[in-house]
């Protein structure tokens, strides 16, 4: 569930190093539990789920939801189970709200119970035992396999509705999972189009950022360090060349950044106030929850100038604790100069987030500039 892409540079990697962009593939939401079928009132078939990461729960109610993930099937070699991707591209679930008449506190800070209130409705059943194995039958039908072949799955709910351009001038992107698939899209698009770079270009898409990154495919692992060393080894280099390459390298950790909210401006820092469509955001923190320093910021600003992109700054209010991202985590495994940046966005961790179309275009151009530098 992680992806690392690279393009070998024309110059020796020990002399030019790596130009790296890091992002993450996961987003907050709901994961379907094993044997998830639950029957209510002898007729409503629900799915038992658990919360993944930190979604804004209220935004998941009354939305048409689809199901996607991966399914593990039987194989001849038990050490290599057959893995199939599954995407049920239709709205098969919904988490219905309770009417305000039955929940008068709905508009007064109602906190949903994660085990009770957020279970999605899948179907109506007509027979008492019909719910047993219902999801397994659905998976088998979608993958065109026998139900007995299914051993396990990693399945998640997601919003079925597609993203769209909104605003009077269509200047905003409204979509699910902007955090952080927007950075993944920009990075993959850039590295697929790079031609004969001098330095070796790398795009690292980690999983599990929303739950701490401490997995073998997360940023808090040896994944990036091992891939970079293997690239050096494939170029007939050794450990010394690897360490020299790291010293000449640069990482852009690209993740969402908080823009000033139009209705809650007081939540932002008094002087650092990023806006949508006003440039990419350089993120800073005295606690080092972001990797940015003056030197790495100077490099990024010059890349933006070359790409014709603007920059803004984000710092948390001093009386509010902020989040972090993959930058500081990956820096503990590879000693490379690093900066944390992102698209300014609103409604982060909502089922549907908002960013500026100009900023996403700028992100792509700046990453292209990095890869050609």
Residue map of PLM features:
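N-terminal hydrophobic/helix-forming segments and targeting peptides
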Residues: 1-373
């Amino acid at each position: 569930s992680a992806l690392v892409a690279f393009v070998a540079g024309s110059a020796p990697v020990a002399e030019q190093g790596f130009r790296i962009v890091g992002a993450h593939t996961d987003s907050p939401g709901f994961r379907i539990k094993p044997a998830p079928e639950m029957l209510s009132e002898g007729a409503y078939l629900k799915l038992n789920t658990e919360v993944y990461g930190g979604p804004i729960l209220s935004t998941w109610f009354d939305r048409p939801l689809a199901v996607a993930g991966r399914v593990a099937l039987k194989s001849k070699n038990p050490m290599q189970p057959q893995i199939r991707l599954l995407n049920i591209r239709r709205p098969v679930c919904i988490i219905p709200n309770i009417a305000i008449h039955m929940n008068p506190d709905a508009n007064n800070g109602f906190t949903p119970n994660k085990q009770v209130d957020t279970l999605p409705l899948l179907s109506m059943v007509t027979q008492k035992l019909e719910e047993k194995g219902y999801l397994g039958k659905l998976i088998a039908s979608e993958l065109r396999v026998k139900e007995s072949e299914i051993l396990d799955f990693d399945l998640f709910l997601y919003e079925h509705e597609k993203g769209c351009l909104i605003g009077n001038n269509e200047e905003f992107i409204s979509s699910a999972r902007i955090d952080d698939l927007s950075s993944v899209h920009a990075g993959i698009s850039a590295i697929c189009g790079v031609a004969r770079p001098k330095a070796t270009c790398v795009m690292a898409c980690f999983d599990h950022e929303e739950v701490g990154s401490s997995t073998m495919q997360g940023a808090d692992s040896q994944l990036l360090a091992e891939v970079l060393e293997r690239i050096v080894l494939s170029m007939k280099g050794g450990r010394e060349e690897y360490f020299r390459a790291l010293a000449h390298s640069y990482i852009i950790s690209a993740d969402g950044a908080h823009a000033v909210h139009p209705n809650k401006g007081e939540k932002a820092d008094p002087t650092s106030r990023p806006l949508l469509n006003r440039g990419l955001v350089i993120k800073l923190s005295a606690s080092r929850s972001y990797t940015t320093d003056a030197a790495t910021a100077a490099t990024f600003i010059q890349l933006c100038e070359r790409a014709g992109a603007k920059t803004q700054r984000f710092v948390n209010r001093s009386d509010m604790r902020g989040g972090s991202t993959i930058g500081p985590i990956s820096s503990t495994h590879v000693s490379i100069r690093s900066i944390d940046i992102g698209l300014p966005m609103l409604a982060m961790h909502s089922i549907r987030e908002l960013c500026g179309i100009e900023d996403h275009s700028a992100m792509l151009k700046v990453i292209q500039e990095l890869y050609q530098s």
